[in-house]
UniProtKB/Swiss-Prot annotation:
CDD domains reported for this sequence: ChtBD1
UniProt keyword annotation of Zinc-finger present: no
Keyword vocabulary terms for this entry: Antibiotic, Antimicrobial, Chitin-binding, Disulfide bond, Fungicide, Plant defense, Signal
Keyword Signal: yes
Source taxon at top rank: Eukaryota
Disulphide-bridged cysteine pairs: C38-C53, C47-C59, C50-C78, C52-C66, C71-C75
Record's protein name: Antimicrobial peptide 1b
Signal peptide: 1-34
Short name of one Pfam family: Chitin_bind_1
Bias (Low complexity): 93-105
Amino acid sequence: MKPHMSATVLRAPRVAAILLAVVLAAVLATAVNGAQRCGDQARGAKCPNCLCCGKYGFCGSGDAYCGAGSCQSQCRGCRDDVVGQALPAEPGSTRATAASSASARGLNLTATTGGP
């Protein structure tokens, strides 16, 4: 006489396989999304590839990430990285020559932002 297997024993491997698949999917989703986190939610991390950092801390493009009220940083993509930064002057360049010439005349060419 063969021993009778209960339904519980037969279901255990199937439940374990489903549980393993769910855990692996969660780990994979966290790893993929973890690289795309930004801003305050990710300790100030910046988005790659000129993406905007949305208000919920995810990188993306379009109004949902870059629009007014939807963006927390890099709202203009890569253009934010250079806005307000002075470009270095090469010796002999027009910019370097103009700056040294103005300085010799007592003029200050420091750029400022804001209104009058």
